[in-house]
Amino acid sequence: MSEEDKTAASAEQPKRAPKLNERILSSLSRRSVAAHPWHDLEIGPDAPAVFNVVVEITKGSKVKYELDKKTGLIKVDRVLYSSVVYPHNYGFVPRTLCEDNDPMDVLVLMQEPVVPGSFLRARAIGLMPMIDQGEKDDKIIAVCADDPEYRHYNDISELSPHRLQEIKRFFEDYKKNENKEVAVDAFLPATTAREAIQYSMDLYAQYILQSLRQ
């Protein structure tokens, strides 16, 4: 057989599929469960004063993201019906539990928007009592502990009246076009916020103990 015939014959033969990397095969056969931000992320050694926050909603966003409690992923709940946007980054404190069976909500004041699903260290400076459609839905007001412009704040009384009014009016108005009633009361100090976080930590611990006993 001539060299030209050999070349033509080899070209006609089907190419063999490359072998998959053994590491890929190994990882596919032994898949591990993905970490859940609510249960697997630690709250932090300095809680309830300084604690981790998982960001769900970016500052300036009109999209209402929220934690999908089953998968641990951040899902789109809805787009806000009004023209307002979230004034600051919004998320939750891991390993906490409130009476509504959700983790503790937090609004984090800082300079920049943060990508949903990331986490940061925050310091509680106050609490905003809120009733959402007849149910208690208080919000912790916090500052990013690693933002040089905000980390020196220790109590909500140190914020300007305009900033407080901005936060209050957002939560009062953001559901009006959905015909849902939200009532916001006067802001409470950092000591009250820390007590609320500690209570939610204790409630979460009780929930875990009950789950283990079942």
Curated annotation (Swiss-Prot):
Mg(2+) 2 binds at residue 105. Transmembrane segments: none annotated. Keywords: Cytoplasm, Hydrolase, Magnesium, Metal-binding. InterPro entries: Pyrophosphatase (IPR008162), Pyrophosphatase_sf (IPR036649). PROSITE patterns: PPASE. GO terms for molecular function: inorganic diphosphate phosphatase activity; magnesium ion binding. Its main location: cytoplasm. Its EC number is 3.6.1.1. It holds the Pfam family Pyrophosphatase. Its cofactor is Mg(2+). GO terms for cellular component: cytosol. It is found in: Cytoplasm. It catalyses: diphosphate + H2O = 2 phosphate + H(+). Substrate binds at residues 64, 78, 90, 174. Residues 1-20 are annotated as: Disordered. Mg(2+) 1 binds at residues 100, 105, 137. Gene3D superfamilies: Inorganic pyrophosphatase. One of its GO terms (biological process) is phosphate-containing compound metabolic process. It is an enzyme of class 3 (hydrolase). PANTHER family: INORGANIC PYROPHOSPHATASE (PTHR10286). Belongs to the PPase family. This is Soluble inorganic pyrophosphatase. It comes from Zea mays.
